[in-house]
Amino acid sequence: MNLLDIIYVRYYKEDGSSLNIGGIESYITQLAKLASSLGAKVRIFQYGTHDFFKQTDSADVYAYFKSGNKNGDFLLKKAAQKHRHDDKWLTIIANDTLIPNYHVSNSIVIQHGIGFDSCFGKNEPLLINFIKRVYQAYPIIKRMQNVDKVVCVDNNFINWYRTQTSFRDVKLIPILNFTEIGPKEEKVSDGPIKIVFARRFVQIRGTRLFAPVAKKLLSTYDNIEITFAGEGPDKEYLKSTIGNDERINFCAYRSDESISFHRQFDVAVVPTIYSEGTSLSLLEAMSAQCAVVCTNVGGMTNIILDEYNGLMVSPDEGELFSALSRLITDQKLRKFLSKNAYDTVNSSFSINKWQKSWKTIIMNNFEN
């Protein structure tokens, strides 16, 4: 039997009540569907508040209770206990933080982007700050030696890895993230220009970068509306910083409605400060024919060509304000960017392209 084991901390909520909602969980769901369609038996191993078993349309889910450190080692051993001598298996570790300190045979890890490129701590002495970064980087480099392949959601990580070591024994495979492709018909846009920030309301996603920019835009332009779509600890900060304005809206939407939700807007802003792969929020906005403004952080640099399919700026209030002002005042530019954005995701970031890449990896593993 061909077995595909996926190791992740929380695919279902720890109490087993429902599936978790998030980018990695969605990734696992699509990967399980693909592997199942190729004839593999898919099993997901995770932690829980108690042992439980669940079944989805494409996978069996085994949850185990464990006190203390919830690492990948325990789940890998649970998966190995269910192998039979005549099975062919492939183990996919869904996050590189779960790689154990020993080599895992027939294994792939999914690397979701650099997560420690923080700009905080900049008041430290330069040498101390640099040493901290080395301390953060070394465990990542080291644990990549313990898997057979590393699937990277952006080329940013691959290029960073090459700067850290001259060793090329780790097989790094770029399979960039994907999005559902929205309708090709051009959106009808009339009335005020609608801008959306559809991210989790946390500082690393740019809430505190965008809030003062949004306030300035509202005081400068009468013909705009700004929507904050999501939840998170910075919600009250956003409200208090921007103040009361009838042109500001706060809402939430279901992840499976993202494309139709984004099609209500003319402009999408993705002002990440750090820790970003190939942003699903950015891809979904492009698929919905929004003109996009994003920061030059992480894997978003693999998506946007500045002034061709979006505007790319540094994580800077002045640059962000200028870019959004251009889109507010230039309808021709908005249309040009939104069309090219749609064409980009349709050709390079579709789920069909993603499935073909993963199919090759999965089938090669079982055939060899």
Predicted regions and their residues:
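A conserved mid-protein helix/loop that constitutes part of the nucleotide-sugar donor-binding site
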Residues: S26-Q30, F197-K216, P233-E236
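Active-site proximal beta-strand in glycosyltransferases
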Residues: I92, Y102-N123, F130-K132, V151
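Membrane-proximal helix-turn-helix segments that form the acceptor-binding/catalytic region
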Residues: N129-V150
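Nucleotide-activated donor-binding/catalytic signature segment of Leloir-type glycosyltransferases, i.e.
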Residues: E236-R254
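Acidic donor-binding loop of glycosyltransferase active sites
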Residues: R263-G277, C290
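Short hydrophobic beta-strand element within catalytic cores of glycosyltransferases
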Residues: A291-C294, I304
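Conserved acidic donor-binding segment of nucleotide-sugar-dependent glycosyltransferases
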Residues: D306-E307, L311-G318, R326-K332
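A short, well-ordered alpha-helix in the C-terminal region of glycosyltransferases
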Residues: R326, L333-S348, W354-T360
